[in-house]
Amino acid sequence: VFCADLSRSIRCCKMHGGVPTEGFTEQFIISTVDAALYAQNVVIAAESAGLGICYIGAVRNDPAQVTALLNLPKNVYPVFGLCLGYPDQNPEPKPRLPISVILKENSYDSSEEDAQIKDYDEVVRTYYAMRSGNPKSQSWSEQMTGLLGKESRPHMRDYLSQQGFEMK
């Protein structure tokens, strides 16, 4: 489980007689990005060693239980889990969103994206239809509509506040 951790920095601040500030949005962003960057480096190393990986966002379904289980102090929260292992099969890799849709140079220009996303939707539909397990019929953009078209983990705001991430 990869955690955003401000408790260490707070202890360092106190160690030097400082008065730590808590709850600022920037601190939340920095600690979350740090956890994600660390995890991504673990993933790169694992995949280079032939391991398969799967990020597990479900640790945020009940973060209080995860916090208790892992004995996390205030100013620490679980961002996601990560499963590592040697695959017992060789599944076809899921096609990724084209880099031309993700990468922006010098300014944000999405004028060509709709056509590229529609093309990607067809690639994803074909992938889901052809894969051996858990076939789906939804396109990628339909999945995004499902994710953004509903409230997701509304308990996180209160949980984060209780952990010291108040978003000032």
Residue spans for each PLM region:
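Acidic, surface-exposed loops and disordered segments
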Residues: 1-168
